[in-house]
């Protein structure tokens, strides 16, 4: 049986996905070319798919699937601050933010559920940790000038966006 701590962490992760979706939607408006639209659009798709993966658990545990206005407004404000930065600096700051504020909680989710007790919840919890690590890897790739910075995120998408021609 899932614990109260698991339920609370699950909601925090879901709210993190909402925040990410709001932030990347705001960042998409500042994309300067097809490559930037692909990267930010892939991040937006990633957060949307993350929310979809979490909803069956939220429903099973009778937890709210409603959008959290506080998370979304905070994310929109953060996106505005990030958008004021140049592209590489934007992703350097994003990577730092995710490492500090989101990744620990996403990784904690997998420690709060046992695969023996609830295999589906454990699988989704483990995926969400990988999900957030992929977001950090994308940010690091942009800072490093990698040729396909979105690869870690695209590899985990069920519905990846078409990559633009160079």
Residue ranges and their predicted role:
Residues 2-166:
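Non-heme di-metal
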């Amino acid at each position: 049986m899932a614990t109260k701590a698991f339920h609370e962490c699950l909601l925090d992760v879901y709210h993190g996905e909402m925040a990410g979706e709001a932030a990347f939607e705001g960042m998409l408006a500042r994309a300067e070319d097809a490559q930037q639209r692909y990267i930010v659009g892939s991040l937006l798709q990633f957060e949307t798919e993350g929310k979809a993966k979490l909803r069956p658990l939220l429903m099973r545990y009778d937890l709210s699937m409603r959008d959290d206005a506080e998370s979304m407004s905070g994310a929109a404000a953060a996106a505005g601050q990030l958008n004021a930065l140049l592209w590489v600096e934007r992703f350097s700051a994003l990577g730092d933010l995710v490492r500090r504020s989101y990744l620990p909680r996403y990784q904690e989710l997998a420690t709060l559920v046992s695969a023996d007790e609830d295999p589906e919840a454990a699988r989704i919890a483990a995926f969400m940790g990988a999900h957030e690590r992929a977001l950090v890897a994308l940010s690091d790739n942009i800072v490093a000038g990698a040729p396909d910075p979105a690869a870690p995120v695209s590899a985990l998408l069920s519905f990846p966006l078409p990559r633009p021609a160079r």
